[in-house]
Amino acid sequence: MRNSPVSPGPGYAPARGSERARRRGVARWLAYVGGVFAGAWLATQLYYAVQIAMWSVFDPGSSAFMRADAWRLSNAQPATTIRHRWVPYDQIARTLKRAVIASEDADFANNSGYEVDAILQAWEKNRARGRIVSGGSTITQQLARNLFLSGERSYIRKGQELIITWMLETLLDKERIFEIYLNSVEFGCGVYGAQAAAQYYYRIPASRLSAWQSARLAVMLPNPKYFDAHRGSPYLAQRAGVIARRMGAAELPASQ
């Protein structure tokens, strides 16, 4: 008996089968792409973790920020001299250690690398501005950013910064974190680390910095290039006085 004119006809089932096959193909492709991205993300995290674990024994040669900044300066200001010299933790004046903690992260010795209140305040500030203008960063977060990440401001980068911060706090003790920070943080145009800063600004080694010199260096950290070019700024002197008064209460991380 012939098919009725209103019946679906013999091509109906194959069409449905073809649609199911197409959907399965799309699902497999999406799963493959997702797997590639997940694998790349995990490989990146493993790379960061291995690097950090190695730094419990070996000193970092440079940071991502230092390399990017040196490249930028070589193009924009080719006459700039890059200054950086690593020195052991015990060859950095205690006055500078206290000044940096008083200026950047008063609870560094006791926090877990994060200050939740500061992060929430930064979130509210960023939401009000409609863009990222503040990060609420601790010393460990600053180090995470300087060691591995670019200078762009985005929530994705901030998330990666928090993951690296957790790795640093898990794999290194506080004193080692602080030692790496003090040897890699920017103190001026092409000036990285405590030893280079002490020699550049005061012609002395980092071990001989006075309390006032240390306070002056510490207050430069939020905007080192600007304060390098404006060393006579009244704000710089006023803020250094505030830091000098706080230094006595600054708690250094315990030696392990």
Curated annotation (Swiss-Prot):
Transmembrane segments: 26-48
Top-level division of the source organism's lineage: Bacteria
UniProt pathway annotation: Cell wall biogenesis; peptidoglycan biosynthesis
InterPro entries: Glyco_trans_51, Lysozyme-like_dom_sf, PBP_transglycosylase, Pep_trsgly
Gene3D superfamilies found in the cross-reference section: Biosynthetic peptidoglycan transglycosylase-like (1.10.3810.10)
GO cellular component: a single term: peptidoglycan-based cell wall
SUPFAM superfamilies listed in its UniProt record: Lysozyme-like
Membrane topology of the entry: Single-pass membrane protein
Catalytic activity: [GlcNAc-(1->4)-Mur2Ac(oyl-L-Ala-gamma-D-Glu-L-Lys-D-Ala-D-Ala)](n)-di-trans,octa-cis-undecaprenyl diphosphate + beta-D-GlcNAc-(1->4)-Mur2Ac(oyl-L-Ala-gamma-D-Glu-L-Lys-D-Ala-D-Ala)-di-trans,octa-cis-undecaprenyl diphosphate = [GlcNAc-(1->4)-Mur2Ac(oyl-L-Ala-gamma-D-Glu-L-Lys-D-Ala-D-Ala)](n+1)-di-trans,octa-cis-undecaprenyl diphosphate + di-trans,octa-cis-undecaprenyl diphosphate + H(+)
A Pfam family: Transgly
Swiss-Prot/TrEMBL keywords: Cell inner membrane, Cell membrane, Cell shape, Cell wall biogenesis/degradation, Glycosyltransferase, Membrane, Peptidoglycan synthesis, Transferase, Transmembrane, Transmembrane helix
EC number(s) on file: 2.4.99.28
Family statement: Belongs to the glycosyltransferase 51 family.
Function in brief: Peptidoglycan polymerase that catalyzes glycan chain elongation from lipid-linked precursors.
UniProt name for this protein: Biosynthetic peptidoglycan transglycosylase
Taxonomic source organism: Burkholderia mallei (strain ATCC 23344)
Taxon lineage: Bacteria, Pseudomonadati, Pseudomonadota, Betaproteobacteria, Burkholderiales
